[in-house]
């Protein structure tokens, strides 16, 4: 199979075959990361700009390293350090970058749909690095890559997503991707942090954590955004932790070989207990490594690379 899309905007409209192509391509990319010399000339002469309108540590540095490991020329821009601070529109920013010859724009933006809008405005490939509460496709892909590495096929797995589902673009992308791959997705959290009609996305909804964890194969713990407490969406961090924090006792409800994931950054002692976060069932640090591999795969595919050329 060959990659045929100009952009990666979300997982909602990707096919299972396209998802597998990305994950398959990430396998040899991870091998590159494990080398002493982490460099391949694959994207020499190609250029990538990271355009971030929101703060980021993991996603931005991950894309930057992904580009560098493939020998692409990379430039990082933030809203505060660019003409955006002077009032330049997103469209004009994109057209300016295109005029400079950029091949790929990786963008994070607070507005849902911003990546899709930019993709319609410019000929360069656009990768959505998070748009509002809409999607965060590369985070979901690295989560799925980690699950596939540890569990094999995702079909039939019971995957629990815990936390603020309402505001989480990570949750949405994971739901779209995992359900396409045949997983049983369970979402659990306070009723005030659960979207209405989320069952229509093909998930099972729980409000009691213990029920959701019963027999789970994967537990993906979302970061609780502290500002939600100020908005009155849950009483206190202590109360949230009491009801929805992942601790050793609750972990015993899951399958004996269940794995723990977290997109980071963690609020240790709130959504996840220290011993669980650093226990032998946690693959949180490996998710970070896998994120670089998945983003390398996407840069390769979106610039015309073919998987079979890597596997030969």
UniProtKB/Swiss-Prot annotation:
Residues where carbamoyl phosphate binds: 58-59, 108, 136, 139, 264-265
Pfam families, per database record: OTCace, OTCace_N
Family matches, as SUPFAM superfamilies: Aspartate/ornithine carbamoyltransferase
InterPro entries: Asp/Orn_carbamoyltranf_P-bd, Asp/Orn_carbamoylTrfase, Asp/Orn_carbamoylTrfase_sf, Asp_carbamoyltransf, Asp_carbamoyltransf_Asp/Orn-bd
Disulphide bridges: none
Binding-site list for L-aspartate: 86, 169, 223
E.C. numbers: 2.1.3.2
Pathway annotation: Pyrimidine metabolism; UMP biosynthesis via de novo pathway; (S)-dihydroorotate from bicarbonate: step 2/3
Keyword Signal: no
Gene Ontology CC terms, in alphabetical order: cytosol
GO MF: amino acid binding; aspartate carbamoyltransferase activity
UniProt keyword annotations, A-Z: Pyrimidine biosynthesis, Transferase
Catalysis performed (reactions): carbamoyl phosphate + L-aspartate = N-carbamoyl-L-aspartate + phosphate + H(+)
Subunit and interaction comment: Heterododecamer (2C3:3R2) of six catalytic PyrB chains organized as two trimers (C3), and six regulatory PyrI chains organized as three dimers (R2).
Recorded family membership: Belongs to the aspartate/ornithine carbamoyltransferase superfamily. ATCase family.
Function per UniProt: Catalyzes the condensation of carbamoyl phosphate and aspartate to form carbamoyl aspartate and inorganic phosphate, the committed step in the de novo pyrimidine nucleotide biosynthesis pathway.
Protein name according to UniProt: Aspartate carbamoyltransferase catalytic subunit
Organism: Desulforamulus reducens (strain ATCC BAA-1160 / DSM 100696 / MI-1)
Taxonomic lineage of the native organism: Bacteria, Bacillati, Bacillota, Clostridia, Eubacteriales
Gene from which the chain derives: pyrB
């Amino acid at each position: 199979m060959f990659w045929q899309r100009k952009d990666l905007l979300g997982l909602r409209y990707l096919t299972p075959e396209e998802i597998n192509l990305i994950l398959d391509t990430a396998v040899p990319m991870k091998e590159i990361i494990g080398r002493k010399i982490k460099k391949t000339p694959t994207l020499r002469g190609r250029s990538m700009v990271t355009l971030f309108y929101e703060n980021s540590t993991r996603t931005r540095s991950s894309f930057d390293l992904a580009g560098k490991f493939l020998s692409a020329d990379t430039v990082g821009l933030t809203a505060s350090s660019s003409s955006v601070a002077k009032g330049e529109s997103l469209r004009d920013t994109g057209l300016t970058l295109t005029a400079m010859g950029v091949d790929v724009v990786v963008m994070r933006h607070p507005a849902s749909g911003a990546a899709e809008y930019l993709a319609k405005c410019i000929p360069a490939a656009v990768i959505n690095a998070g748009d509002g509460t809409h999607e965060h496709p590369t985070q979901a892909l690295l989560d799925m890559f980690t699950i596939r590495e540890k569990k094999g096929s995702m079909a039939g797995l019971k995957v629990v997503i815990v936390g603020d589902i309402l505001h989480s673009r990570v949750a949405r992308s994971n739901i779209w991707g995992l359900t396409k791959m045949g997983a049983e997705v369970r979402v659990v959290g306070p009723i005030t942090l659960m979207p209405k009609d989320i069952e229509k996305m093909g998930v099972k909804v729980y409000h009691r954590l213990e029920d959701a964890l019963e027999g789970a194969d994967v537990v993906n713990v979302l970061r609780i955004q502290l500002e939600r407490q100020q908005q009155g969406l849950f009483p206190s961090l202590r109360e949230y932790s009491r009801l929805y924090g992942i601790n050793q006792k609750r972990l015993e409800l899951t399958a004996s070989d269940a794995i723990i994931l977290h997109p980071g950054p963690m609020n240790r002692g709130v959504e996840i207990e220290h011993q669980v976060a650093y226990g032998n069932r946690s693959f949180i640090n490996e998710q970070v490594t896998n994120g670089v591999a998945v983003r390398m795969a996407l840069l390769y595919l979106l610039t015309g690379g073919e998987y079979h050329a890597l596997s030969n």
